[in-house]
Amino acid sequence: MNAPASPAASPSQRARKPDWIRVKAPTSPGYAETRKLMRELNLHTVCEEAACPNIGECWTKKHATVMILGDTCTRACAFCNVKTGMPRPVDLLEPEHTAIAAAKMGLSHIVITSVDRDDLPDGGASQFVKVINALRRETPQTTIEILTPDFRNKPESAVAAIVDARPDVYNHNLETVPRLYPTIRPGARYYASLRLLESVKRRDPSIFTKSGIMLGLGEERMEVHQVMDDMRSADIDFMTMGQYLQPTPKHAKVIDFVTPQAFDAYAQIARAKGFLQVASSPLTRSSYHAGDDFEHMRAAREAQLARVRAD
């Protein structure tokens, strides 16, 4: 994992996926029903837009990560398959449609993410608030996890407004190690993302915070360990690690396919550093098994508090 990251690769250079990263094409009735509902409500999902390898499994179970604020991002990260350009105006019906979808699917846990909207004064924070409020009204039993952009160069009040809307989990991904930011995530700043997550916990310590990185981009083992330490310094509760997969030949190429055993080893180290929850495998993505992971994290916090009270 010492090779430098390359910004792109030709089709002939694209590495062949090992067996452990291969998944079956989605064909189930549950998948078709989820897809139909999203179309009817004019909702976008990161599952489709980012070409997630787990879409078949998740949609079969009627789990979907709704991507608000449209399907066009104002940035062009080297790893991401979401299209870039000038976005359309914000859909005023999106909050209500998202809540209707959650209710119809009977979701116990929902993940809401978005494209970057650098064109909006608050980066789209107010739309997150509206979606959270609509979900609370329509399906109050559903726990809410949000995965936000970094709101770079936006007022601090943008993130504060989302925190005050009380999502159950606030996720913002660091994506990769600091050294690779100039080529992999050039529109963002590593320490700014850490500060965002710190600010969430500082404003409302009861909200679970979560972040993740991709592996296979040329990062070194000790760099991954340092990211873990940085996350714990920011009091992040949940860390995810998954294999980067090159969406198209225009995107950053895969430097190596990290073995399942290496992912397990990283998970052991992360748990030893004090995270309440760790998800680490080749197919791990931010919202993969998010509902189950939330329950495990909540139970881990309760056990932790019980130990403190006992002492």
Curated annotation (Swiss-Prot):
It holds the Pfam family LIAS_N. [4Fe-4S] cluster 2 binds at residues 73, 77, 80. Gene3D superfamilies: Aldolase class I. Its cofactor is [4Fe-4S] cluster. [4Fe-4S] cluster 1 binds at residues 47, 52, 58, 287. Belongs to the radical SAM superfamily. Lipoyl synthase family. This is Lipoyl synthase.
